[in-house]
C-alpha cells in the first residue's frame, strides 16, 4: 500500500508478469479505480509500434504504464529489451489527479520487479521514442 492508501490489484501484478515473463503483452497502461483505492489495468496491448503505445496515453489524465522497449545495441551487437515504467502526468491533468498519482506511484513501482528504466512524462515530447532511447542509453552506457 502507498502513502495515499492505494493498493495494487492482483490483476495489475498478473498483467505485469505476463508482459515480463510470458511476453504476452508489449505494453500495459494502469489507472486508479474510480474510488481511488486501487491501481488496476486500464488497457494492455500486443502492438509493437511505440507510437501506438504513446497514442493510448490520455491527453488530459494521469496514468502509469509499462512498455517492453526494444532497441538496437551499437556496432551490430543486436537488439536488447528493457522494461520501462512510465509515470504519465500531463500538464493538462487536474492538480488533484497529479497529487494522487504521485503519492500512489511507489506502491506500484515496488510491486513491479524487473523495471529497467523509469520515465516521468508531462507532455508527449518527454515520452517520445528518441527521448526514452536517450535515457536508456545513459543508464546502460550505450553512448
From Swiss-Prot:
One of its GO terms (cellular component) is nuclear matrix. It is found in: Cytoplasm; Cytoplasm, Cytoskeleton; Nucleus matrix. GO terms for molecular function: actin binding. InterPro entries: ADF-H (IPR002108), ADF-H/Gelsolin-like_dom_sf (IPR029006), ADF/Cofilin (IPR017904). Controls reversibly actin polymerization and depolymerization in a pH-sensitive manner. It has the ability to bind G- and F-actin in a 1:1 ratio of cofilin to actin. Binding to F-actin is regulated by tropomyosin. It is the major component of intranuclear and cytoplasmic actin rods. Required for accumulation of actin at the cell division site via depolymerizing actin at the cell ends. In association with myosin II has a role in the assembly of the contractile ring via severing actin filaments. Involved in the maintenance of the contractile ring once formed. Belongs to the actin-binding proteins ADF family. This is Cofilin. It comes from Ogataea parapolymorpha (strain ATCC 26012 / BCRC 20466 / JCM 22074 / NRRL Y-7560 / DL-1). The gene is COF1.
Amino acid at each position: 500500500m502507498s502513502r495515499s492508501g492505494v493498493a495494487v490489484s492482483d490483476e495489475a501484478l498478473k498483467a505485469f508478469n505476463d508482459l515480463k515473463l510470458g511476453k504476452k503483452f508489449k505494453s500495459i497502461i494502469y489507472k486508479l479505480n474510480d474510488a481511488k483505492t486501487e491501481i488496476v489495468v486500464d488497457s494492455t496491448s500486443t502492438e509493437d509500434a511505440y507510437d501506438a503505445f504513446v497514442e493510448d496515453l490520455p491527453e488530459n489524465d494521469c496514468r502509469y504504464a509499462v512498455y517492453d522497449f526494444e532497441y538496437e545495441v551499437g556496432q551490430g551487437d543486436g537488439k536488447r529489451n528493457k522494461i520501462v515504467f512510465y509515470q504519465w502526468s500531463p500538464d493538462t491533468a487536474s492538480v488533484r489527479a497529479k497529487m494522487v498519482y504521485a503519492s500512489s506511484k511507489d506502491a506500484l513501482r515496488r510491486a513491479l520487479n524487473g523495471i529497467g528504466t523509469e520515465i516521468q512524462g508531462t507532455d508527449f515530447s518527454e515520452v517520445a521514442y528518441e527521448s526514452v532511447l536517450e535515457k536508456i542509453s545513459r543508464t546502460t552506457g550505450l553512448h
